[in-house]
């Protein structure tokens, strides 16, 4: 069982809208997972929600704009900010600066690890199916090699 995970040795997933570097797979924990998100200037993932997940983001670098729920005004995010996304809440973050927006994301599963998607790869395959993305193109060209 692993207790310490390196942010230097990650598996990279390059979605059409952002990068996720997997730090701790949900299969290695009871009810959480950890990854680093990188958005290039102008990038934003699609508006989406996670019905079974509460997310916590810690902004490491860059500038962003959070759209969340039914809020009419977006929220600015900057290094040092912590963002909370409640379960079943539509959200997305835009990179609005001239440099990449990078944040550490911790997904917490209040009901335990999702049975339908027990690993990060199974989750990525489901996301790709919903968005119409090719899984093989999302996994880093080097086969998801450790960076």
Which residue stretches match the model-derived regions?
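Conserved short histidine dyad/triad with adjacent acidic residue
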Residues: 35-51
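Histidine-centered metal-chelating micro-motifs
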Residues: 44-46, 65, 73, 83, ...
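A short, N-terminal "cap"/entry segment at the start of jelly-roll beta-barrel domains
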Residues: 1-32, 46, 118-147
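Residue-level recognition of conserved beta-strand positions in structured domain cores
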Residues: 36, 49, 60, 68-70, ...
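Ligand-binding loop in jelly-roll beta-barrel domains
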Residues: 79, 87-114
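Conserved hydrophobic/aromatic beta-strand scaffold that supports enzyme active sites
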Residues: 34-38, 56, 74, 82-84, ...
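A generic "binding-loop/recognition-motif" signal
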Residues: 19, 43, 52-53, 71, ...
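A short beta-strand-loop-beta hairpin characteristic of the jelly-roll/cupin
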Residues: 54-79
């Amino acid at each position: 069982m692993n207790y310490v995970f390196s942010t230097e040795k990650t598996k990279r997933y390059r979605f059409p809208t952002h990068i996720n570097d997997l730090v701790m797979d949900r299969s290695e924990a009871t009810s959480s997972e950890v990854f680093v998100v990188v958005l290039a200037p102008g990038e934003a993932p699609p508006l989406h929600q996670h019905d079974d997940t509460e997310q916590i983001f810690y902004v490491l670098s860059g500038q962003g704009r959070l759209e969340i729920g039914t809020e009419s005004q977006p929220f600015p995010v900057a290094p040092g900010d912590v963002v909370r996304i409640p379960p079943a809440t539509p959200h997305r973050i835009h990179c609005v600066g001239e440099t990449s927006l990078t944040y550490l994301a911790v997904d917490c599963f209040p009901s335990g690890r999702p049975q339908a998607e027990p690993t990060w790869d199974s989750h990525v395959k489901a996301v790709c199916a919903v968005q119409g993305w090719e899984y093989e193109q999302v996994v880093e060209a080097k086969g998801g090699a450790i960076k």
